[in-house]
Amino acid sequence: MIKLFNTLSKNIEVFKPIDEVVKIYCCGVTVYDLCHLGHARSYIAWDILRRFLIYSDYKVKYVQNFTDIDDKILKRAKEENSSMNEVSEKNITEFHKDMDALGIMRPDSMPKATNHICNICSFIKVLEDKGFAYIRGGDVYYSVFKNKNYGKLSNQNILEQNINQQGRITTDESNKKENPQDFALWKKAKDNEPSFDSPWGKGRPGWHIECSAMVKDELGETIDIHLGGSDLIFPHHENEIAQSESANNKKLANYWLHNGMVNVNGQKMSKSLKNFTTIRDLLDSGTSPMTLRYFVLTVNYRKPLDFTDEALKSASEAWKNINVALSLFDITKKENLSIEVNETNEFVEETYKDMINYEISQKKIKFTNALNNDLNTAGAIAIIYELAKPLKNFINQFQRIKNLEINTNEKFHLRETFKTLEELTDVLGLKKEEIIIDNRINEDQILSLINKRLGAKKEKDYAEADKIRNLLKEKGVELIDQSPELTTWVRI
């Protein structure tokens, strides 16, 4: 049975679905920029949860939203002399590229906030009619003091809250509130900004109400699992609970799961510290998608993930060994050695077959038990390594000894081990990658890094510029600075 740590109860609990279909909602991105390593960590973790539920014979409906109206999007549109919709659509496309590259299954539904305005307004109206919301000059606010259970997810004491903790508020908003802890459900339209009609006049929804409305519209009033990063526990998820349970008089979610944050060399990842890395930058620098995925899986999803060059290099080496094992059939086929097919005249001793089948069944049980234990991916990877090791050893021997002969028992062992390795790596979303013979990177990756280096030099971040130059040199590329704005390159 699957056991998960529930942030709401602060305990590991046995997972018991409400109905035949497990209903999951995951908070999605605000689409104003490319995704960073924190997004990779979060969405890989929840992809494992979804895959494991399916592997465990559950039916799953998985919904993840896009916040496509927000101050950050409007600011980016102004910077780019673009529109809110153009910025959103561009970054939604880029989001899919990154997630597809990392092997993350697309959600069953990905609603956009702007497509749910009518439902959001209806939701707010219910809160207003029940006395949980009040109007101030075209804005609508939720009154947290009307909810005696407010703070149950985060253990926040309302009276001790800092006004700044409510997130995404302005000084103008704080001056309109009955209490500093209240939060916006609807924001009055500003001049020259996109807005929507509502019972309270033109405006746009607050951040928190979007998810409450979309959860109800897509999955119903009570769902099985709600997902997100630990940075969303307060205020976002606390406010979701307040809104939804006030409006519906029902529990919003039975299980709340939160992933830990990403640190870089022991420090919190942030743009201000200049240690901020996008998924795109990392992949363009030569890190393979499955290396990044493997790296994320080495640490329990609830713990902080410390991103260092050394840890990534270690993950790369470990993944290469598994990837070689997953290439068994490709490698042996080239030399006309048939392992993949069970030939009609192939005889395998029954006692040997029983022994191998038992060994493999035990590994599958250990793998399942690891993931049953609050998604212990490190424990699951240990079993993957046990399966990959004999395959890797055989490949080394096969490549070293010409015309290597193996008997039918050995073929059976290799074939069944390989099939199991494929099955279990699929649960972890680890897919075979083309084996790279040398350390070369392609031209698009080189140009992307050159542009990133030019940007670093423009910001006078010469340490980052030197780091990129050295990285390219390791990959066999020499940079030639023709001018402050022009850099050419040659392979060496």
Swiss-Prot record:
Annotated family: Belongs to the class-I aminoacyl-tRNA synthetase family.
Domain of life from the UniProt record: Bacteria
Subunit structure as annotated in this protein's UniProt entry: Monomer.
Identification of the protein by name: Cysteine--tRNA ligase
Cross-referenced InterPro entries: Cys-tRNA-ligase, Cys-tRNA-synt_Ia_DALR, Cys-tRNA/MSH_ligase, Rossmann-like_a/b/a_fold, tRNA-synt_1_cat_dom, tRNAsynth_Ia_anticodon-bd
Binding site residues for ATP: 271
Motif ('HIGH' region): 29-39
